């Protein structure tokens, strides 16, 4: 089978995507697959460069990659691909839509408001949520242009900066606690990974720089583990995810978990969280790639 590892793209996460793609190409079982690297530099490449491949292994992140656009093109071209379909990809990429769905499904997530470019900032609603709040692009990823704001006077500048990256901005209550990530593969949760950033929160540098944070498989207390697992699987189902996704949460000091967001194409760099989780149950990176391909092929699109 000829597998095209699709990487690069046109989003702010291009460099991370290239790292993910290279890691996959380096680690994939070349005795089992004929592997080609496909670097996307412009949108047309997703049509022109995929000719002749039997399967698209997606290592794209951010817009035009993780938002369902590429998945729709590949489906139109009848090329099987890895991970979630167009609908779940686009819903998870839109933090406002995904939080609306979680709220409707009675899955705990922080209070928020969403702004379009011409909307007035509703300071009363923000005050009602209570400071600090997090300001970030609604469709962004990797914590690009994400700010923790502690006072009303700093809101406007943060919103202005976030709008440089997106047409919508989300402002949500900052939940203080420990960040964990819960990879879900099919209908099962892989081991929980704890994230201990060395900065104030898990920002771009902490995510992708060596030593930016400590990340390790962790064993939660039984009751908390059961609640986290139930929430992760319910979130995966509510957002119609397929094959695999990474559900990120914050757990407060009182052991109350909140859903942060869902990543449908999580990073696959040497620092990435899903390979660390899989290693916790003795699944190598190469085996994980195999599993993703095998499960993706089974999905009827």
Swiss-Prot record:
InterPro entries: ATP-grasp, ATP_grasp_subdomain_1, D-Ala_lig_Van_CS, D_ala_D_ala, Dala_Dala_lig_C, Dala_Dala_lig_N, PreATP-grasp_dom_sf
UniProt KW Cell wall biogenesis/degradation keyword: yes
Comment on bound cofactor: Binds 2 magnesium or manganese ions per subunit.
Cofactor(s) this protein requires: Mg(2+); Mn(2+)
S-S pairs: none
Domain of life: Bacteria
GO biological process: cell wall organization; peptidoglycan biosynthetic process; regulation of cell shape
SUPFAM superfamilies hit by this protein: Glutathione synthetase ATP-binding domain-like, PreATP-grasp domain
Binding-site list for Mg(2+) 2: 261, 263
GO CC entries: cytoplasm
Catalysed reactions, semicolon-separated: 2 D-alanine + ATP = D-alanyl-D-alanine + ADP + phosphate + H(+)
Pfam families (alphabetical): Dala_Dala_lig_C (PF07478), Dala_Dala_lig_N (PF01820)
PANTHER family: D-ALANINE--D-ALANINE LIGASE (PTHR23132), D-ALANINE--D-ALANINE LIGASE B (PTHR23132:SF23)
Function: Cell wall formation.
Name of this protein: D-alanine--D-alanine ligase
Source organism (scientific name): Clostridium botulinum (strain Eklund 17B / Type B)
Source species taxonomy: Bacteria, Bacillati, Bacillota, Clostridia, Eubacteriales
Gene: ddl
